[in-house]
Amino acid sequence: METSSSGITNGRTRVFHPVAKDVNILFDELEAVNSPCKDDDSLLHPGNLTSTSDDASRLEAGGETVPEKNKLNGLYFRDGKCRIDYILVYRKSNPQMEKREVFERNIRAEGLQMEKESSLINSDIIFVKLHAPWEVLGRYAEQMNVRMPFRRKIYYLPRRYKFMSRIDKQISRFRRWLPKKPMRLDKETLPDLEENDCYTAPFSQQRIHHFIIHNKDTFFNNATRSRIVHHILQRIKYEEGKNKIGLNRLLTNGSYEAAFPLHEGSYRSKNSIRTHGAVNHRHLLYECWASWGVWYKYQPLDLVRRYFGEKIGLYFAWLGWYTGMLFPAAFIGLFVFLYGVITLDHCQVSKEVCQATDIIMCPVCDKYCPFMRLSDSCVYAKVTHLFDNGATVFFAVFMAVWATVFLEFWKRRRAVIAYDWDLIDWEEEEEEIRPQFEAKYSKKERMNPISGKPEPYQAFADKCSRLIVSASGIFFMICVVIAAVFGIVIYRVVTVSTFAAFKWALIRNNSQVATTGTAVCINFCIIMLLNVLYEKVALLLTNLEQPRTESEWENSFTLKMFLFQFVNLNSSTFYIAFFLGRFTGHPGAYLRLINRWRLEECHPSGCLIDLCMQMGIIMVLKQTWNNFMELGYPLIQNWWTRRKVRQEHGPERKISFPQWEKDYNLQPMNAYGLFDEYLEMILQFGFTTIFVAAFPLAPLLALLNNIIEIRLDAYKFVTQWRRPLASRAKDIGIWYGILEGIGILSVITNAFVIAITSDFIPRLVYAYKYGPCAGQGEAGQKCMVGYVNASLSVFRISDFENRSEPESDGSEFSGTPLKYCRYRDYRDPPHSLVPYGYTLQFWHVLAARLAFIIVFEHLVFCIKHLISYLIPDLPKDLRDRMRREKYLIQEMMYEAELERLQKERKERKKNGKAHHNEWP
């Protein structure tokens, strides 16, 4: 193979490059060497770096040594040289002292350094500071296959790019006169927030000279150091026995009270970041990500990943992608709503309702509800048109396609992120068995087919029996939800009569709206109360199943909680959409609950207004409550902790707490990790897609909420929570499958909402079959003349049941008692051969509804599958970059190995120990 005979020296490292076989290389060899990748402190302002090698001369000249400075910031040991990588917290009064002593003795045996400090607030609390020296980091980084940078990436660019680059240079001259992109972070006044692209490889101590190491203290960033220390702690014994191992078990049995990595100092600074730079990465994250002043800017995902790890970085990447994709959905939804506003004055149906002063409607409840003119519901007819108009069907199809496009392009976006963050070839380590599983099944063992070691085993019969009990518990809780919905239904049918007899005319005349509004608020309270119960039941059932590993436990718990909360949140919405007013009977023969309460009817303008109110109120209240609990609850708890400290030590005494004590007083991350954050967004995604045909403004509300949600979550992670352990993940896990399921369900529900809940199909049938334009192939507004009258049936008042007969005889309308009233249905008049039987128009409408559901579902599903087929999971340029990177890495590894062998041969010749080798 043809190789380069000369190398380029950069500092301590002599780098050899393979000969490029194509001249179209973006970065030449000299640039590749002179522009090395950045270390952990390179994102900060040069004047604020805390590295000992960088700051020694500057600080000593000012009379202050580096160790003295490091002692003050609370991030180092007492000597000011060893950085704190992990904190353990326990109480001296805890009886598990023997286990801690064995555990800490083994920690020192692994090479970790340790110091202990008492709390300034409570002397019973002890902080154990842990530091991993370079030798320990290198040894375990090699075991964990931690990928580290060793060469700047070299991109292949086609010849066409040369011509395009010249054009871009000309365009860039004019761009200087244009305003800068407001959504991008200002990289001129702030430090560069993105890493330079570097080739990475699993760290190897034998090939350490090939990695880009400017400073051993910052080669492994703080998140990686903490992850390595946590990995060590999970494999240290605290007692004799094969299962007495790991920090998690000590946290479970109370030996340690807390364990966490440190934040990198304060998130605030007296000086502006634009003039003095960032004090630390936490400060940089706060200013560029968690501050409300940057709510409109893109997220610095690379910095989030460096500080919190890939798992949390992927969550914010997904949340940002979801929020960005909501922009077109919100715009189209707003357009549908505005289209209804613009066409409101031209809507023939609304005109006929508002002008129908001579049409008297039958009472909507027993006795107390009066007769009413159809024109009294003019406002509701206009509001219904805002959401149920000609653009609704288009919007439903658009949202179904949007959900597919969102998921397909997220797969592509995830692939790019996985490539940039070195997650393509990453595989999770073999998971440890849960301590609860080991304790339960320690007497039964079998050989693990992967590790070849004996492990506890759960019999198939035992597993099936537990799953059956768990499924029964899930079914019972779903029945509880249905019972709660049934209670809301009874409330609605009972309250509508009460409001109809109310003294206040405003409530009496709007009894149905008042009933719906109060029922929705009560339903929201029930939802929030049941959510607390569901969490405890889901936890109980998941522990009953005895999952083997933490990921199995997490997946099982996630499915249960999602199922419970989804049913809890949407059950009343499903009732209003598909059951309200569908099975009420007709005047003179009403259907009743337990032969007592008459089922609730829809408003004369239809049931869609009830569905809109349900979705709007629930969505606004739930998002407001979630945002308050996410930020307000930690703020209140942290304020209460500070208040207790001031009361114990006096408000006039100012205590300077070290960083470990400040972090200990913050709230720990949720016990379920990112579960609550994902669940909130997934339920919102369901609300945005499942009933979007009835509420086109749902995407807009979701967009506004998510813009706030991103900054709330960022603020919470940076300022209110302890720093979570930096974990790795390749994707969003089981949530992607749930999103796909919601996308499929949304197609079905929107088809039924359009066909059954809205009046789209009845209007269509009337226009083409019964209206003035019947048989002419037209369906404009002029073809809807007479639709309202055709959609109402006639009832003879003397046919009322005794318990349904209203107290009023309707003489207030014409001066004489009414003989007939109208109601929404397609039935024959009382004097026909079959009184109150279904008309032919009813069967035509029913057939059209069923046909629409079938056609809509098949059409949309075909479009979804076509889009999924046409959009590849990996972008073509990314696929080419991956293949080229693999090729170049092989070449560079070959060069490195060849260099090592040649060096060894020269040394053997020099020492006079040369012997024959066939290669090289």
Swiss-Prot record:
Topology in membrane: Multi-pass membrane protein
Chief site of localization: membrane
Alphabetized Pfam families for the sequence: Anoct_dimer (PF16178), Anoctamin (PF04547)
Signal peptide: none
Gene Ontology cellular component terms for the protein in this record: plasma membrane
Physiological role: Has calcium-dependent phospholipid scramblase activity; scrambles phosphatidylserine, phosphatidylcholine and galactosylceramide. Does not exhibit calcium-activated chloride channel (CaCC) activity.
Protein family membership: Belongs to the anoctamin family.
Protein name from the UniProt record: Anoctamin-4
